[in-house]
C-alpha cells in the first residue's frame, strides 16, 4: 500500500476531523571564503504527523520516518492529546470526497558549488581583488503530502535558494568595514543565471563597500527618511505583519484594538498574498496551509484602515472568522503557527527620483537583513547601507547606525510612496524557521536614526 492509501485508510477510520501529513525537509549550505570552500553541509528531516480537531481545539502527534509509526497510531496519540483539552471530542460529520491539489517541484542542489564559485569570481573581478569575500549559497527544500478527513489532500513541494554575501575592507582610516546582503530566488541554484537583476545587485554590493571607505557619522534624531523597496518590505514584515498575526493579537498585540479603525493615509494598502500577485505565482505560494485550510489573500490594511488579520483554525474560531490559510509548520514535528506568506505594501505613483529631490536633509536607507519588533509595533532595524540626502541629492555613505520607531506612527508619517516595487525572499524565525517573501515600494517617512 502506498503512502496515500495509508493516509486514506487512517483518516477514514477516525471518528473525528483529522489531517495526516508526510513531510521531508532538506537543507544544503555551501560557503566560500575568498574563493576557497570552507563549508559544504547538508541536513535532512523526514517524518509524519497527525492532527485531530474538535471545535477550536486540536490534538497533535508526530514521529520521525525512521520509527516507521503508522498514521493510525499517530491519530490515536493525537486523539489522546485532544482528550486532555476536550472531554468529549466532536465526531466528524464530513463526507469523504476525494480531491487532490498538487503543486510539486524537484529538489536539485547539484550545481550549488559551481554557481557560488562563478558569483564569487564575478564579485572579485569587479572589486579588483580589494574585498574580503564570504559567500553562502543555501538551499531550502520542503516536500509535503497531506490528506484531510474530508477527502481533500495533495502534494506541495517548494525549493528556494538564498545567497548571503559579506564583503569586507578597510576605510580611509584603516578601520574594518563590511557590507552584508541577502537575496534569493525560487528554484535551484542554477536559476541564478536567469535572474536579470542579479549582476546589478552584485555590482551595487561592491559599490556599497567602496562608498563606506569614505563614510560620515550619522546625525541622530527624528529625520526625513526614505526607505528603499527592500527596507520597506522588511518594515512591513517585522513591524506590521507580526502585529496582525492572530495568535499575537490573542497575546496582546496592539492591532487587536485597532481592527476596523483608520490608522494611516488612504494611499496605504498592505496585503498578505497567498500564492499570486498580479497574475504571477509568488516565491512562497501557499494554496493550502498545514491545517489543510484553503489559503486566501488577507488585506491587512485597506485604504488606510486596519482591515483584517491572519488566522489559523484556532484563532479564527476565537475571533469568529474563517481561517485565512496562514497556519504554517517548519518541520513534521512542529505544530502549525500563524505565519505570514507573501506580505506586501502596494506601490504608489511617484518616481523615486522626485521623492529624493523633495528631501532637504535626511537619509536614504538602502538595505538591511534583519529587524525586531514587539507586540506594540515598536521596532528596531540595523541597516547595512545608508546614505545622506542633502538638498535633494544623495550624498555620502553613513557609518553604522540603527533606526527605531513604532510602525503605526511611521505609517501615519508616510508622505510619499514610489511607483517602483519589488519582492524579496527571506527567513522568518518566529519560533520556527519558514521561508517568507516581502514586497514593497520606496516610502518617505519620519524615523528615529542614531549610531549603532
Where are these regions (language model features)?
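N-terminal small-residue-enriched
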Residues: 1-452
Amino acid at each position: 500500500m502506498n503512502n496515500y492509501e495509508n493516509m486514506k485508510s487512517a483518516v477514514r477510520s477516525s471518528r473525528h476531523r483529522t489531517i495526516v501529513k508526510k513531510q521531508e525537509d532538506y537543507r544544503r549550505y555551501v560557503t566560500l571564503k575568498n574563493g576557497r570552500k570552507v563549508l559544504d553541509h547538508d541536513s535532512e528531516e523526514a517524518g509524519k504527523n497527525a492532527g485531530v480537531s474538535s471545535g477550536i481545539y486540536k490534538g497533535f502527534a508526530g514521529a520521525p520516518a525512521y520509527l516507521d509509526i503508522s498514521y493510525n497510531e499517530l491519530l490515536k496519540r493525537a486523539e489522546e492529546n485532544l482528550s486532555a483539552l476536550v472531554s468529549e471530542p466532536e465526531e466528524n460529520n464530513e463526507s469523504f470526497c476525494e480531491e487532490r491539489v498538487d503543486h510539486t517541484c524537484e529538489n536539485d542542489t547539484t550545481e550549488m558549488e559551481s554557481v557560488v564559485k562563478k558569483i564569487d569570481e564575478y564579485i572579485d573581478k569587479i572589486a579588483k581583488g580589494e574585498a574580503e569575500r564570504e559567500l553562502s549559497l543555501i538551499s531550502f527544500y520542503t516536500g509535503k503530502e497531506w490528506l484531510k478527513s474530508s477527502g481533500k489532500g495533495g502534494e506541495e513541494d517548494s525549493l528556494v535558494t538564498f545567497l548571503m554575501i559579506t564583503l569586507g575592507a578597510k576605510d580611509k582610516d584603516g578601520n574594518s568595514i563590511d557590507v552584508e546582503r541577502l537575496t534569493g530566488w525560487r528554484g535551484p541554484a542554477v536559476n541564478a543565471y536567469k535572474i536579470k537583476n542579479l549582476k546589478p545587485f552584485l555590482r551595487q554590493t561592491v559599490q556599497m563597500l567602496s562608498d563606506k571607505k569614505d563614510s560620515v557619522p550619522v546625525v541622530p534624531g527624528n529625520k526625513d527618511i526614505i526607505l528603499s523597496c527592500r527596507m520597506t518590505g522588511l518594515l512591513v514584515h517585522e513591524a506590521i505583519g507580526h502585529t496582525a498575526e492572530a495568535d499575537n493579537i490573542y497575546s496582546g498585540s496592539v492591532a487587536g484594538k485597532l481592527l476596523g479603525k483608520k490608522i494611516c493615509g488612504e494611499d496605504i494598502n498592505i496585503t498578505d498574498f497567498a500564492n499570486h500577485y498580479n497574475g504571477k505565482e509568488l516565491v512562497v505560494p501557499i494554496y493550502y496551509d498545514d491545517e489543510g485550510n484553503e489559503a486566501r489573500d488577507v488585506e491587512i490594511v485597506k485604504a488606510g484602515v486596519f482591515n483584517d488579520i491572519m488566522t489559523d483554525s484556532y484563532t479564527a474560531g476565537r475571533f469568529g472568522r474563517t481561517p485565512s490559510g496562514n497556519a504554517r509548520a517548519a518541520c513534521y514535528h512542529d505544530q502549525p503557527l500563524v505565519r505570514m506568506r507573501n506580505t506586501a505594501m502596494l506601490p504608489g505613483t511617484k518616481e523615486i527620483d522626485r521623492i529624493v529631490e523633495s528631501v532637504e536633509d535626511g537619509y536614504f536607507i538602502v538595505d538591511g537583513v534583519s529587524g525586531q519588533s514587539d507586540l506594540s509595533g515598536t521596532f528596531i532595524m540595523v541597516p547595512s547601507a545608508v546614505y545622506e540626502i542633502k538638498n535633494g541629492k544623495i550624498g555620502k555613505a553613513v557609518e553604522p547606525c540603527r533606526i527605531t520607531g513604532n510602525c503605526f506612527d511611521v505609517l501615519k508619517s508616510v508622505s510619499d510612496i514610489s511607483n517602483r516595487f519589488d519582492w524579496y525572499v527571506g527567513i522568518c524565525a518566529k519560533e520556527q524557521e519558514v521561508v517568507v517573501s516581502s514586497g514593497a515600494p520606496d516610502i518617505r517617512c519620519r524615523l528615529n536614526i542614531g549610531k549603532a
